[in-house]
Amino acid sequence: METEQPEETFPNTETNGEFGKRPAEDMEEEQAFKRSRNTDEMVELRILLQSKNAGAVIGKGGKNIKALRTDYNASVSVPDSSGPERILSISADIETIGEILKKIIPTLEEGLQLPSPTATSQLPLESDAVECLNYQHFKGSDFDCELRLLIHQSLAGGIIGVKGAKIKELRENTQTTIKLFQECCPHSTDRVVLIGGKPDRVVECIKIILDLISESPIKGRAQPYDPNFYDETYDYGGFTMMFDDRRGRPVGFPMRGRGGFDRMPPGRGGRPMPPSRRDYDDMSPRRGPPPPPPGRGGRGGSRARNLPLPPPPPPRGGDLMAYDRRGRPGDRYDGMVGFSADETWDSAIDTWSPSEWQMAYEPQGGSGYDYSYAGGRGSYGDLGGPIITTQVTIPKDLAGSIIGKGGQRIKQIRHESGASIKIDEPLEGSEDRIITITGTQDQIQNAQYLLQNSVKQYSGKFF
């Protein structure tokens, strides 16, 4: 009696009679098989969570997380951390990961409140031990949510595609918003991929991304993000105080209304992304900083904070002059706008005009230099214009007036200006700290203005 061949031994050399060709339906079956076989492989998904929401995944006495492990035969963990973030790790095949996410997503959106028995009975549960994984105010999955995936930085290119073609296709096909943050998580090689939309669409998008990156080997060293190293001065797409202040509304989705810059595919009716986002869409993987201009030595490194520095603005009514680090004319160009502790930041820049601010951020004349990313092609921000980077130095004893308690001031400045702002730790033996500002020209000018006012208002009032 003829026995059925297992799927794993599907012959690649099968022929169709004497013609030696495969029928079209067989080709389609093989393609479907390849996809299903790939989804059966074990993969790991890591999701960045707010620490306060981890309890809903774990449940009282660990009942929820134990039920997820048992019902889906998967590895699910949420290691503890001392900061505001934790990482949800799920190891299973891609389809199972999708089912687990559909259980978990509602509680990540809603918080830790236990739903009513009526709400619980309306949703099919694998186990009544996961009864708190429900969304109280919505039936089914008709609500917006977002998840933050963690991926190795070398895998970003596979998600973005050539000239952004892949990420655009993902957005359109899954009807989600996808944002790949430029900055790596603190002390790691991980980057955040923010995905927003209806839960089913978000899950489908994540499954496609997992399928993409599971076929790509990681290049370079791997240092997974440890939430214990949370640092509010990094602009990597993690959770901040701003998220809590907005009563849990996802950062990627502002309230409905006019004025937003709509990055959704046309005809979808999704919520727009705001023009004041502190990051910009990354349409190509960052290759590190561009080389310094001739005759200038870059500080090295691969982070935006290490990009070459723009020239300072010239004095009014005069030619471009060299300035020393105290902001005074001198015979040596240091290449960095600097301020000393005794004269304070605002005293040095209070008198700058808008045109002088502009000259501080734009490449000048024949020695012009493109500060944009992506190998000179340039990136464009939400408000138009190339993304550029500039740096300023401040005395380290003034940094507190910018950062604020728990980093609240610097977060607010980032949010209001739309620029990425990073503050370096002082180098050994140095009395200065370097502030790196990345964004469009308008965003950088707004950030400089807000930073100046912060120093002016809070100087001497340290946290």
Curated annotation (Swiss-Prot):
Location(s) in or outside the cell: Cytoplasm; Nucleus, Nucleoplasm; Cell projection, Podosome
Modified residues (N6-succinyllysine): 219
Region named Interaction with ZIK1: 209-337
Skewed-composition ranges (Low complexity): 252-266
Keywords: Acetylation, Activator, Cell junction, Cell projection, Cytoplasm, DNA-binding, Glycoprotein, Isopeptide bond, Methylation, mRNA processing, mRNA splicing, Nucleus, Phosphoprotein, Repeat, Repressor, Ribonucleoprotein, RNA-binding, Spliceosome, Transcription, Transcription regulation, Ubl conjugation
Sequence positions bearing N6-acetyllysine: 34, 198, 405
Per-repeat ranges for Sequence: 54-76, 59-62, 245-250, 257-260, 267-270, 295-298, 324-329, 399-421, 404-407
Chain positions found as Phosphotyrosine: 380
Phosphothreonine carried by residues: 39
Domain KH as annotated: residue spans: 42-104, 144-209, 387-451
GO MF terms held by the record: DNA binding; RNA binding
Post-translational modification: Sumoylated by CBX4. Sumoylation is increased upon DNA damage, such as that produced by doxorubicin, etoposide, UV light and camptothecin, due to enhanced CBX4 phosphorylation by HIPK2 under these conditions.
PROSITE patterns assigned: KH_TYPE_1
Location of the region described as 2 X 22 AA approximate repeats in the Swiss-Prot/TrEMBL record: 54-421
Annotated crosslink Glycyl lysine isopeptide (Lys-Gly) (interchain with G-Cter in SUMO) location: 422
Region entry Necessary for interaction with DDX1, spans: 1-276
Domain of life: Eukaryota
Residues joined by cross-link Glycyl lysine isopeptide (Lys-Gly) (interchain with G-Cter in SUMO2): 34, 52, 60, 163, 219, 405, 422
Annotated Basic and acidic residues bias: 19-37, 276-285
GO biological process per UniProt: mRNA processing; RNA splicing
Region (Disordered): 1-37, 250-329
Entry function: One of the major pre-mRNA-binding proteins. Binds tenaciously to poly(C) sequences. Likely to play a role in the nuclear metabolism of hnRNAs, particularly for pre-mRNAs that contain cytidine-rich sequences. Can also bind poly(C) single-stranded DNA. Plays an important role in p53/TP53 response to DNA damage, acting at the level of both transcription activation and repression. When sumoylated, acts as a transcriptional coactivator of p53/TP53, playing a role in p21/CDKN1A and 14-3-3 sigma/SFN induction.
Subunit structure: Identified in the spliceosome C complex. Interacts with ANKRD28, RBM42 and ZIK1. Interacts with DDX1. Interacts with MDM2; this interaction leads to ubiquitination and proteasomal degradation. Interacts with p53/TP53. Interacts with BRDT. Interacts with IVNS1ABP. Interacts with PPIA/CYPA. Part of a transcription inhibitory ribonucleoprotein complex composed at least of the circular RNA circZNF827, ZNF827 and HNRNPL.
UniProt-recorded name of the protein: Heterogeneous nuclear ribonucleoprotein K
Taxonomic lineage from the root: Eukaryota, Metazoa, Chordata, Craniata, Vertebrata
